[in-house]
Amino acid sequence: MFKNVFGSGFLVRTAHVILTWVITLILFLHDTDLRRQEETGELTLPVLFVLLVLVSVLLYFAVSLMDPGFVLTDDCDLQFTLGIAEETQDMIPQTTKSIRLRRCGHCLVQQPMRSKHCQTCQHCVRRYDHHCPWIENCVGERNHRWFVLYLAVQFVVLLWGLYMAWSGFSHASTWQQWLRTNGVLLGAAAVVAILALTVLLLLGSHLYLVSLNTTTWEFMSRHRISYLKHCGADENPFDKGILRNLWGFFCAWEPVVWEHVYFKQGNDPI
Protein backbone atom coordinates (compact mmCIF):
# COMPACT_ATOMS: atom_id res chain seq x y z
CA MET A 1 0.00 0.00 0.00
CA PHE A 2 2.77 2.39 0.86
CA LYS A 3 5.88 3.16 -1.11
CA ASN A 4 9.37 3.32 0.33
CA VAL A 5 9.61 6.24 2.78
CA PHE A 6 13.17 6.90 1.62
CA GLY A 7 12.28 7.07 -2.07
CA SER A 8 12.65 9.97 -4.49
CA GLY A 9 10.40 12.25 -2.42
CA PHE A 10 12.40 11.94 0.80
CA LEU A 11 13.89 15.45 0.56
CA VAL A 12 10.52 17.02 -0.28
CA ARG A 13 8.80 15.30 2.63
CA THR A 14 11.63 16.15 5.01
CA ALA A 15 11.50 19.81 3.98
CA HIS A 16 7.72 19.88 4.50
CA VAL A 17 7.98 18.41 8.00
CA ILE A 18 10.84 20.72 9.01
CA LEU A 19 9.02 23.82 7.74
CA THR A 20 5.82 22.78 9.52
CA TRP A 21 7.42 22.29 12.91
CA VAL A 22 9.78 25.29 12.64
CA ILE A 23 6.81 27.60 12.07
CA THR A 24 4.93 25.91 14.91
CA LEU A 25 7.94 26.44 17.19
CA ILE A 26 8.16 30.11 16.19
CA LEU A 27 4.51 30.59 17.16
CA PHE A 28 5.21 29.12 20.60
CA LEU A 29 8.44 31.04 21.18
CA HIS A 30 6.92 34.46 20.50
CA ASP A 31 4.33 36.25 22.59
CA THR A 32 1.33 34.80 20.77
CA ASP A 33 -1.96 33.63 22.25
CA LEU A 34 -0.50 30.10 22.20
CA ARG A 35 2.46 31.16 24.33
CA ARG A 36 0.34 33.23 26.73
CA GLN A 37 -2.16 30.44 27.33
CA GLU A 38 0.63 27.93 27.81
CA GLU A 39 2.26 30.16 30.44
CA THR A 40 -1.01 30.61 32.34
CA GLY A 41 -1.68 26.86 32.37
CA GLU A 42 -4.60 27.01 29.94
CA LEU A 43 -3.43 24.18 27.71
CA THR A 44 -6.60 23.44 25.74
CA LEU A 45 -5.84 25.76 22.82
CA PRO A 46 -2.11 24.91 22.54
CA VAL A 47 -2.79 21.16 22.71
CA LEU A 48 -5.56 21.36 20.09
CA PHE A 49 -3.30 23.38 17.81
CA VAL A 50 -0.43 20.89 18.09
CA LEU A 51 -2.80 17.95 17.56
CA LEU A 52 -4.24 19.57 14.42
CA VAL A 53 -0.73 20.20 13.10
CA LEU A 54 0.10 16.55 13.81
CA VAL A 55 -3.04 15.39 11.97
CA SER A 56 -2.06 17.50 8.96
CA VAL A 57 1.43 15.95 8.94
CA LEU A 58 0.01 12.42 9.19
CA LEU A 59 -2.43 13.09 6.33
CA TYR A 60 0.43 14.52 4.29
CA PHE A 61 2.43 11.32 4.71
CA ALA A 62 -0.65 9.20 4.00
CA VAL A 63 -1.35 10.81 0.61
CA SER A 64 2.37 11.04 -0.13
CA LEU A 65 3.17 7.37 0.49
CA MET A 66 -0.13 5.77 -0.49
CA ASP A 67 -0.59 3.82 -3.71
CA PRO A 68 -2.65 6.29 -5.79
CA GLY A 69 -4.16 3.48 -7.85
CA PHE A 70 -1.36 2.06 -9.95
CA VAL A 71 -2.46 -0.21 -12.81
CA LEU A 72 -0.44 -3.36 -12.21
CA THR A 73 -0.79 -6.36 -14.54
CA ASP A 74 -3.09 -7.05 -17.45
CA ASP A 75 -4.60 -10.16 -15.86
CA CYS A 76 -5.90 -8.66 -12.62
CA ASP A 77 -6.74 -5.24 -14.03
CA LEU A 78 -8.59 -6.50 -17.08
CA GLN A 79 -10.62 -8.82 -14.88
CA PHE A 80 -11.48 -5.87 -12.64
CA THR A 81 -12.19 -3.41 -15.44
CA LEU A 82 -14.20 -5.62 -17.78
CA GLY A 83 -15.89 -7.85 -15.22
CA ILE A 84 -19.63 -7.36 -15.26
CA ALA A 85 -21.71 -8.30 -12.23
CA GLU A 86 -24.61 -10.64 -13.07
CA GLU A 87 -27.17 -8.40 -11.46
CA THR A 88 -26.23 -5.44 -13.70
CA GLN A 89 -25.68 -7.15 -17.06
CA ASP A 90 -29.09 -6.21 -18.40
CA MET A 91 -28.48 -2.54 -17.59
CA ILE A 92 -25.22 -2.31 -19.56
CA PRO A 93 -25.05 -2.17 -23.36
CA GLN A 94 -23.48 -5.17 -25.05
CA THR A 95 -20.58 -3.03 -26.30
CA THR A 96 -19.05 -2.81 -22.83
CA LYS A 97 -18.29 -6.53 -22.86
CA SER A 98 -15.97 -6.13 -25.81
CA ILE A 99 -14.17 -2.90 -25.00
CA ARG A 100 -10.66 -2.92 -26.41
CA LEU A 101 -8.58 -0.92 -23.99
CA ARG A 102 -5.59 1.09 -25.15
CA ARG A 103 -2.21 -0.38 -24.29
CA CYS A 104 0.20 2.03 -22.63
CA GLY A 105 3.25 2.73 -24.76
CA HIS A 106 5.44 3.14 -21.68
CA CYS A 107 4.64 0.38 -19.18
CA LEU A 108 2.78 -1.81 -21.74
CA VAL A 109 -0.26 -2.53 -19.55
CA GLN A 110 -3.79 -2.06 -20.86
CA GLN A 111 -5.21 1.16 -19.50
CA PRO A 112 -8.67 1.22 -17.88
CA MET A 113 -10.78 4.25 -18.76
CA ARG A 114 -9.72 7.49 -16.99
CA SER A 115 -6.23 6.14 -16.28
CA LYS A 116 -3.03 7.80 -17.52
CA HIS A 117 0.67 7.03 -17.47
CA CYS A 118 2.74 9.21 -15.13
CA GLN A 119 6.25 9.80 -16.43
CA THR A 120 7.52 10.61 -12.93
CA CYS A 121 6.07 7.57 -11.14
CA GLN A 122 6.58 5.32 -14.20
CA HIS A 123 3.14 3.75 -13.73
CA CYS A 124 -0.33 4.11 -15.16
CA VAL A 125 -2.69 5.48 -12.50
CA ARG A 126 -6.43 4.79 -12.23
CA ARG A 127 -8.64 7.88 -12.44
CA TYR A 128 -5.49 9.96 -12.79
CA ASP A 129 -5.82 13.53 -11.55
CA HIS A 130 -2.27 14.92 -11.54
CA HIS A 131 1.24 14.34 -10.26
CA CYS A 132 1.78 16.61 -7.27
CA PRO A 133 5.38 17.73 -6.59
CA TRP A 134 4.32 18.85 -3.10
CA ILE A 135 3.63 15.28 -2.02
CA GLU A 136 5.94 13.75 -4.66
CA ASN A 137 3.22 11.30 -5.64
CA CYS A 138 0.37 11.00 -8.09
CA VAL A 139 -3.16 11.89 -7.05
CA GLY A 140 -5.47 9.19 -8.32
CA GLU A 141 -8.37 6.89 -7.52
CA ARG A 142 -7.11 5.62 -4.16
CA ASN A 143 -5.73 8.77 -2.56
CA HIS A 144 -7.67 11.64 -4.15
CA ARG A 145 -10.26 11.95 -1.37
CA TRP A 146 -7.48 11.87 1.23
CA PHE A 147 -5.64 14.56 -0.71
CA VAL A 148 -8.71 16.83 -0.59
CA LEU A 149 -9.16 16.08 3.13
CA TYR A 150 -5.50 16.92 3.69
CA LEU A 151 -5.92 20.24 1.89
CA ALA A 152 -8.93 21.10 4.07
CA VAL A 153 -7.10 20.29 7.32
CA GLN A 154 -3.95 22.07 6.15
CA PHE A 155 -5.97 25.18 5.30
CA VAL A 156 -7.50 25.27 8.78
CA VAL A 157 -4.02 24.88 10.33
CA LEU A 158 -2.62 27.69 8.20
CA LEU A 159 -5.50 30.07 8.97
CA TRP A 160 -5.18 29.32 12.67
CA GLY A 161 -1.40 29.79 12.49
CA LEU A 162 -1.83 33.12 10.70
CA TYR A 163 -4.20 34.32 13.41
CA MET A 164 -1.76 33.22 16.11
CA ALA A 165 1.09 35.05 14.36
CA TRP A 166 -1.03 38.20 14.21
CA SER A 167 -1.71 37.95 17.94
CA GLY A 168 2.03 37.92 18.63
CA PHE A 169 3.02 41.19 16.97
CA SER A 170 4.18 43.72 19.57
CA HIS A 171 4.17 47.52 19.31
CA ALA A 172 7.31 49.61 18.98
CA SER A 173 8.13 53.31 18.70
CA THR A 174 9.92 53.02 15.32
CA TRP A 175 9.75 50.76 12.28
CA GLN A 176 13.32 49.67 12.79
CA GLN A 177 12.64 48.60 16.35
CA TRP A 178 9.38 46.91 15.29
CA LEU A 179 11.20 44.89 12.63
CA ARG A 180 13.92 43.84 15.08
CA THR A 181 11.28 42.68 17.53
CA ASN A 182 8.85 41.07 15.08
CA GLY A 183 11.03 40.21 12.07
CA VAL A 184 11.11 36.44 12.58
CA LEU A 185 7.39 36.28 13.33
CA LEU A 186 6.66 38.49 10.31
CA GLY A 187 8.64 36.15 8.07
CA ALA A 188 6.77 33.14 9.42
CA ALA A 189 3.43 34.92 8.93
CA ALA A 190 4.34 35.78 5.33
CA VAL A 191 5.18 32.14 4.57
CA VAL A 192 1.95 30.98 6.21
CA ALA A 193 -0.11 33.55 4.28
CA ILE A 194 1.37 32.48 0.93
CA LEU A 195 0.81 28.80 1.72
CA ALA A 196 -2.75 29.48 2.92
CA LEU A 197 -3.62 31.22 -0.35
CA THR A 198 -2.06 28.38 -2.36
CA VAL A 199 -3.92 25.70 -0.41
CA LEU A 200 -7.20 27.63 -0.68
CA LEU A 201 -6.88 27.80 -4.47
CA LEU A 202 -6.03 24.09 -4.65
CA LEU A 203 -8.89 23.11 -2.34
CA GLY A 204 -11.40 25.25 -4.21
CA SER A 205 -10.37 23.93 -7.62
CA HIS A 206 -10.46 20.30 -6.50
CA LEU A 207 -13.88 20.64 -4.86
CA TYR A 208 -15.18 22.26 -8.03
CA LEU A 209 -13.83 19.45 -10.23
CA VAL A 210 -15.07 16.78 -7.82
CA SER A 211 -18.56 18.31 -7.93
CA LEU A 212 -18.48 17.81 -11.71
CA ASN A 213 -16.96 14.30 -11.47
CA THR A 214 -14.00 15.28 -13.60
CA THR A 215 -10.26 15.33 -12.95
CA THR A 216 -7.56 17.94 -13.42
CA TRP A 217 -6.16 15.93 -16.34
CA GLU A 218 -9.58 15.62 -18.01
CA PHE A 219 -10.37 19.29 -17.42
CA MET A 220 -7.09 20.52 -18.90
CA SER A 221 -6.71 18.01 -21.75
CA ARG A 222 -10.18 16.85 -22.77
CA HIS A 223 -9.41 17.71 -26.43
CA ARG A 224 -6.64 15.07 -26.36
CA ILE A 225 -8.49 12.32 -24.49
CA SER A 226 -10.10 9.69 -26.72
CA TYR A 227 -13.23 9.19 -24.62
CA LEU A 228 -13.89 12.94 -24.18
CA LYS A 229 -12.74 14.74 -27.32
CA HIS A 230 -15.95 13.90 -29.20
CA CYS A 231 -18.12 15.25 -26.34
CA GLY A 232 -19.55 18.76 -26.33
CA ALA A 233 -17.91 21.53 -24.32
CA ASP A 234 -20.46 21.16 -21.50
CA GLU A 235 -20.88 17.39 -21.76
CA ASN A 236 -19.38 15.04 -19.18
CA PRO A 237 -20.32 11.34 -19.44
CA PHE A 238 -19.35 10.75 -15.79
CA ASP A 239 -21.41 13.59 -14.27
CA LYS A 240 -24.29 12.36 -12.06
CA GLY A 241 -25.19 15.71 -10.51
CA ILE A 242 -23.37 17.66 -7.79
CA LEU A 243 -24.72 15.80 -4.75
CA ARG A 244 -24.23 12.32 -6.21
CA ASN A 245 -20.77 13.27 -7.45
CA LEU A 246 -19.73 14.48 -4.00
CA TRP A 247 -21.28 11.46 -2.30
CA GLY A 248 -19.56 9.06 -4.67
CA PHE A 249 -16.21 10.78 -4.20
CA PHE A 250 -16.19 11.04 -0.40
CA CYS A 251 -18.47 8.23 0.76
CA ALA A 252 -18.40 5.41 -1.83
CA TRP A 253 -15.50 3.04 -1.20
CA GLU A 254 -16.19 0.43 -3.85
CA PRO A 255 -13.99 0.76 -6.97
CA VAL A 256 -15.83 2.08 -10.01
CA VAL A 257 -15.63 0.50 -13.46
CA TRP A 258 -15.78 3.72 -15.47
CA GLU A 259 -16.48 1.86 -18.72
CA HIS A 260 -19.86 0.90 -17.26
CA VAL A 261 -20.68 4.50 -16.33
CA TYR A 262 -19.52 5.77 -19.71
CA PHE A 263 -21.61 3.37 -21.81
CA LYS A 264 -24.69 3.74 -19.62
CA GLN A 265 -24.77 7.32 -20.90
CA GLY A 266 -25.20 5.99 -24.44
CA ASN A 267 -21.72 6.81 -25.72
CA ASP A 268 -20.26 4.90 -28.64
CA PRO A 269 -17.34 2.49 -28.26
CA ILE A 270 -13.94 4.19 -28.41
Curated annotation (Swiss-Prot):
GO molecular function: protein-cysteine S-palmitoyltransferase activity
Reactions catalysed: L-cysteinyl-[protein] + hexadecanoyl-CoA = S-hexadecanoyl-L-cysteinyl-[protein] + CoA
InterPro entries to which the protein is assigned, alphabetical: Palmitoyltrfase_DHHC (IPR001594), PFA4/ZDH16/20/ERF2-like (IPR039859)
Ranges for domain DHHC: 102-152
Protein origin, superkingdom: Eukaryota
Coiled coil spans: none
Name of the protein in question: Palmitoyltransferase ZDHHC12-B
Gene, per the UniProt record: zdhhc12b
